[in-house]
Amino acid sequence: MIRRAPFLILLRFCRMGKMACSGYPPFQGRIVLSEMPAHRLAALIRSKEVSALEVAESFIDNIEASDSRICAFLYTDFSYTRDVARRVDEELKSATKLSPLAGVPIAVKDMILTRDMPTTAGSKILEGWIPPYNATVIERISRARMPILGKTNQDEFGMGSSTEYSAYKTTRNPWDLSRTAGGSGGGSSAAVSASQAPLALGTDTGGSIRLPAHCTGTVGIRPTYGSVSRYGVIALASSFDQVGPCSSNILDAALLHEVIAGYDPADAVSIKDQDLNFSQAAYEGANRGISGVRLGFVNPSNWCNSKITDLFGRTLKSLESEGAVLHEVQFPNFDHAVQAYYLIMQAEASSNLSRYDSIRFGPQEMAASASGTVSKTRSIRFGPEVKRRILLGTHILSAGYYDDFYMSAQKIRLLVKRDFAKIFSLVDVLLLPTAPTPAFKLGEKIDHHTSMYKSDTATTPASLAGLPAGSIPMGVIDGLPVGLQIIAPGQFDSRVYSTGAAIEQIIGDIHAMKNTKHNTGQTA
């Protein structure tokens, strides 16, 4: 028996004309706005059943009540949030045509430039810095009239897998406050998981959207490289960095993806011709189901723990019973991908972070000379993980090691791309567990760097190849959510949404299992 996701049944009925034009039947009982998906909130705002300001206040209340425990946000500006919400309500009164997500609040990762709001990339070297302009994606959500709630916590400059390397605070997992929310963008996914925000923006270099989604039981999408503008996004590794949506369900992610995607001449790798019908793909996937879809998979037993491996196997059997066509595929260079990624990423990061000299922006630690000021500022204000990766990256690019390390990693990158090309000649999408383990205990891996880096084992291959990939909830193990990763060919992001929506229908909503007796830690 398929457990249908309620919101997709609701949307299906709406599309069949069985509901009023407002899209939803009258509510019965208490309305909890902060627990509703973004697409439903948007419909309620458009139909004027609730105001955008009421929706904003609901999430503001949640942030004020819970963020002292979760630590998802680095900065909030609720006056701005309320001002945008009021503007939406006024425009609705005048029958102004608004975007599908108008009035729906959003949180933004601190890697993304926001004019008039601090942007620090989770680092003390940018403490208090307020950018003079918005990133392209911020301009687009502003035009869509989406109120920004604030900036979310992250590992410093995106370097980490647990948000423990933030210079300001450690984000905690809403499922169990003793565990990580993932990284680097743990703040965005934790905010969505804790109902502090219905939507969030993240950035994904080697898995920084997908890994937090896995840890927090949310949806996180890495778009095709070049499909969402990087202009105004603080660079970690320029050949990998992508902005993407974080949400509680596939449809919401698709709607947000449509807002932020599209060509931008300010980004040198921006793709001109794109198919942006992601929400339509989600609708069609939910209606059509998984039958006939060719699902590739790789046996994860040599890199995943046994419980995730078993759950992945059961999930594949469930999908096969619903008509999916399974293919176990060969991925010869899978085991080398994470190593190649870290070599290239650290090399690019050492170059990108050389611009933080304290002269142009950020606070200064004064010394007797200009060079001394630069050296002192970088020594004091960069965190230990950032320093470690800058040193490694500089070493990788140095004479005598460039060919052995950097060029060898680039050769592996090419081989990974070829592996994917062969895989997608046989299947429509590739499925993998998103990570080797459920969310680990805070402090467990912070001094075990190799173990921390291995958290990215399954997410780095898609990053190397520039492919679209998303993590959706696969189930719960010992009270903790785990994710299923869907990877599609380049510029076929719609397959992530259609397949994800179909699988989401079969797996059902895992959030009813939150705060169960299996959860041994304090919960939010």
UniProtKB/Swiss-Prot annotation:
One of its GO terms (cellular component) is glutamyl-tRNA(Gln) amidotransferase complex. Pfam families: Amidase. The active site is at 109 (charge relay system), 184 (charge relay system), 208 (acyl-ester intermediate). It is an enzyme of class 6 (ligase). Its EC number is 6.3.5.7. It comes from the Bacteria. GO terms for biological process: translation. It catalyses: L-glutamyl-tRNA(Gln) + L-glutamine + ATP + H2O = L-glutaminyl-tRNA(Gln) + L-glutamate + ADP + phosphate + H(+). Keywords: ATP-binding, Ligase, Nucleotide-binding, Protein biosynthesis. GO terms for molecular function: ATP binding; glutaminyl-tRNA synthase (glutamine-hydrolyzing) activity. HAMAP family: GatA (MF_00120). Allows the formation of correctly charged Gln-tRNA(Gln) through the transamidation of misacylated Glu-tRNA(Gln) in organisms which lack glutaminyl-tRNA synthetase. The reaction takes place in the presence of glutamine and ATP through an activated gamma-phospho-Glu-tRNA(Gln). Belongs to the amidase family. GatA subfamily. Heterotrimer of A, B and C subunits. This is Glutamyl-tRNA(Gln) amidotransferase subunit A. It comes from Tropheryma whipplei (strain Twist).
